[in-house]
Amino acid sequence: MDIILVSGSAGLIGSESVRFFCDRGYTVVGIDNNMRKFFFGEDASTDWNRDQLIQEYGDRYIHHSIDIRDQEAITNIFKTYNKDIDLIIHTAAQPSHDWAASDPFMDFTVNANGTLVLLENTRQICPEATFIFCSTNKVYGDNPNFLPFVEQELRWEIAETHSYWSGIDETMGIDSCKHSLFGASKVAADILVQEYGHYFG
């Protein structure tokens, strides 16, 4: 059985990933403990979205309300589905710049350590699975602010003659620029994912 595992499954990108694969007949295992409510208050709760996914997809969506930093609980999920896990889509994160500044340990452990927990379980239990990490433009710090922008009718665009006109990729540097604490924790996670790919395939 092909299993898709999605962290942050009740959030915006995670829930769209769940819908995409459930609509195509896959079984999706979702991990989301609604930390948005903790970070931003009751109005930011994703419980409604989780409940909608459960109602909409029934047995095709299996939800686990687990913190991605909980190594034992995450390992138990990975061991339950073992090599049936074909794809991991990691969208879970601590997304608040204000929270990162007020509690840098929480920010770093969710974004970097939580990513490491998922990577290591993938390596140990389902090494053939594909791992997709959803990062953020904040890993580039303030570097994008110095690109040549052209004012359009509705927004600013990068000049068509620039190499990043069709999108910014990993060739943009992340050093020697200003980062937020949130951006720094996501850089750590980003580099972990890249290095796991280099070391372990």
Where do the PLM segments sit?
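N-terminal Rossmann-like NAD(P)+-binding domain of SDR-like oxidoreductases, especially those catalyzing
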Residues: M1-G201
